[in-house]
């Protein structure tokens, strides 16, 4: 039985069709357990996930030029096992694995591989965004681990009736509902004027490629604790704190702007069943807030918290519809934001560490992921950035350090205004204030400056002596 694509799937389909033969719609991650597991039982557990989560078995085709999907029959699969002597050898494999395209039609949209690295077992999975999202990968980790433990004790795994196909009917009902009409009205009225573009970095020419690279860093336990303590005491989420710091930075480097816009992903799963179902649900929303240089960091956090509550009530409305409405209303092309900010905290009870791999492409100039999924005492910050815009990972590292510096200031002095926030790191301030102004040189101490000037003029009479703006 063939079914139409949902709106989130259609967006991925269009993207993959445009960037054919690329890995742009791949999503890839792995989990490593704290010990070695039996690969035969782990293979059975993975197969059980494929059997029960029918969304994994979705396959795609075109009928009369339109995309369609169907659930392929389940057949037991031999999951390959790869053994690596070092983490470095595994990293080479994983990064290559993540960047191998998944074919759009004619076959399965995922690939599992069991891996063993330095005495630890785990598995890596790559899937098309047509059938999965970041939440789905948390389900993989949780369910496959649970299935392994159940099978290892000889117990039976209960059946479930989770099917992504059910979401097609849910979406159809939403598109005919009063809720949809209210959401459409909200977003149509949200931007009476053209939203100001919050540019992260100016480019002398249009970006023609979406090739990307990735940079990651980890906060210290002390910094992580100070962030968590501040958020708890202030009654705000960690996502809001990180977003506030990024918005303050964007406001400072876009001096003329009176508002700042970033993109945020939304789970788009409203029921327990949807939260237990593998599939592509996730959507994007523009988050726009007024930012004045005189508002305090505390006020910015409060404004963002209110903005979250407001737009989350209308999160089901498709982003492409939002974008189309604004484009038609204000006659513009392009995107609404340069920066996507994603705070990931979906927990799993699996006793292991998750890792995520880049597919080598990035739709947005900069995508920042703040990861708090492994019950760790340290946040991981990952930046995917377009290499045509940003020259190197050193540039991204500097940018992240600026953001972390702003967060530190907000945490220690929340009444600091946006205008007062330092947007340079301590090392940058040292360079700008002291190193660049270190003009001391040796010169003959027995002569006056006007004598030295006269002698220099006699030696090089045709050289420029003074520059003022465009005059010499």
Regions found by a protein language model. Name each.
Residues 1-20, 43-89, 93, 106-108, ...:
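Short amphipathic alpha-helices and their capping loops
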Residues 1-4, 35-51, 70-106, 184, ...:
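A short, small/polar-residue-rich loop/turn motif at beta-strand boundaries
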Residues 2-17, 90-94, 137-138, 181-182, ...:
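AMP-binding/adenylate-forming domain of the ANL superfamily
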Residues 2-4, 8, 115-165, 393-412:
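Active-site-proximal acidic secondary-structure segment that organizes catalysis
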Residues 16-27, 54-56, 106, 120, ...:
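His-Asp-centered acyl/peptidyl-transfer active-site segments
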Residues 20-26, 72-74, 117, 124, ...:
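Short, flexible turn/loop "capping" segments at secondary-structure junctions
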Residues 33-57, 125-142, 213-257, 295-299, ...:
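Acyl activation and transfer enzymes in specialized metabolism, enriched
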Residues 60-62, 114-118, 370-374:
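Short, low-complexity Ser/Thr-rich regulatory SLiMs
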């Amino acid at each position: 039985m063939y079914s139409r694509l949902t709106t989130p799937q259609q967006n991925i389909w269009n993207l993959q069709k445009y960037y054919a033969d690329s890995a742009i719609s791949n999503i890839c991650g792995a989990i490593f357990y704290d010990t070695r597991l039996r690969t035969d039982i782990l293979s059975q557990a993975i197969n059980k996930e494929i059997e029960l989560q029918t969304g994994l078995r979705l396959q795609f085709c075109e009928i009369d030029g339109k995309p369609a999907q169907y659930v392929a029959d389940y057949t037991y699969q031999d999951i390959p096992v790869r053994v690596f002597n070092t983490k470095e050898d595994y990293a080479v494999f994983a990064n290559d694995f993540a960047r191998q395209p998944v074919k759009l039609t004619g076959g399965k949209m995922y690939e599992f591989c069991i891996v063993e690295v330095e005495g630890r077992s785990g598995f890596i999975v790559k899937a098309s965004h047509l059938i999965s999202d970041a939440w789905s990968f948390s389900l993989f980790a949780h369910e496959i681990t649970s299935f392994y433990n159940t099978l290892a004790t000889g117990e039976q795994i209960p059946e479930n009736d989770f099917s992504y196909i059910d979401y097609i009917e849910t979406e159809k009902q939403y598109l005919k509902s009063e809720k949809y009409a209210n959401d459409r009205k909200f977003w149509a009225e949200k931007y009476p004027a053209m939203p100001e573009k919050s540019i992260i970095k100016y480019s002398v020419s249009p970006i023609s490629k979406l090739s990307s690279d990735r940079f990651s860093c980890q906060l210290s336990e002390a910094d992580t604790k100070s962030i968590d303590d501040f958020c708890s005491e202030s009654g705000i989420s960690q996502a809001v704190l990180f977003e506030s710091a990024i918005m303050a930075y964007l406001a400072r480097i876009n001096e003329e702007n009176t508002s700042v816009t970033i993109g945020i992903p939304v789970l788009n799963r409203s029921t327990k069943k949807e939260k237990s179902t593998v599939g592509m649900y996730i959507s994007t929303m523009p988050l726009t807030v007024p930012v004045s240089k005189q508002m305090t960091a505390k006020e910015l956090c409060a404004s963002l918290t209110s903005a979250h509550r407001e737009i989350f009530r209308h999160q089901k409305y498709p982003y492409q519809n939002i974008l189309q409405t604004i484009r038609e209303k204000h006659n513009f092309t392009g995107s609404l934001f340069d920066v996507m900010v994603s705070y990931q905290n979906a927990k799993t009870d699996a006793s292991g560490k998750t890792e995520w791999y880049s597919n080598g492409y990035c739709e947005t100039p900069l995508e920042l992921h703040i990861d708090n999924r492994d019950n760790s005492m340290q946040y991981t910050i990952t930046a995917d950035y377009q290499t045509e815009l940003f020259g190197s990972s050193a540039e991204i590292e500097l940018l992240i350090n600026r953001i972390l510096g702003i967060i530190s200031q907000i945490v220690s002095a929340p009444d600091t205004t946006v205008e007062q926030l330092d947007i340079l790191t301590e090392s940058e301030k040292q360079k700008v204030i002291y190193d660049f102004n270190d003009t001391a040189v040796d010169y003959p101490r027995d002569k006056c400056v006007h004598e030295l000037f006269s002698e220099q003029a006699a030696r090089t009479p045709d050289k420029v002596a003074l520059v003022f703006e465009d005059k010499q």
